[in-house]
């Protein structure tokens, strides 16, 4: 559903932020 899609996008976004901070 739409909520699941949004959740997945938020996970990807958060993962990108974490990777950016760590590098």
UniProtKB/Swiss-Prot annotation:
GO molecular function: oxidoreductase activity, acting on paired donors, with incorporation or reduction of molecular oxygen, reduced pteridine as one donor, and incorporation of one atom of oxygen
Subcellular location: Secreted
Function as written in the Swiss-Prot or TrEMBL entry: Has no antimicrobial or anticancer activity.
Keywords: Amphibian defense peptide, Secreted
Record's protein name: Aurein-4.3
Biological process, per Gene Ontology: defense response
InterPro entries: Aromatic-AA_hydroxylase_C
Tissue localization of expression: Expressed by the skin dorsal glands.
Superkingdom of the source species: Eukaryota
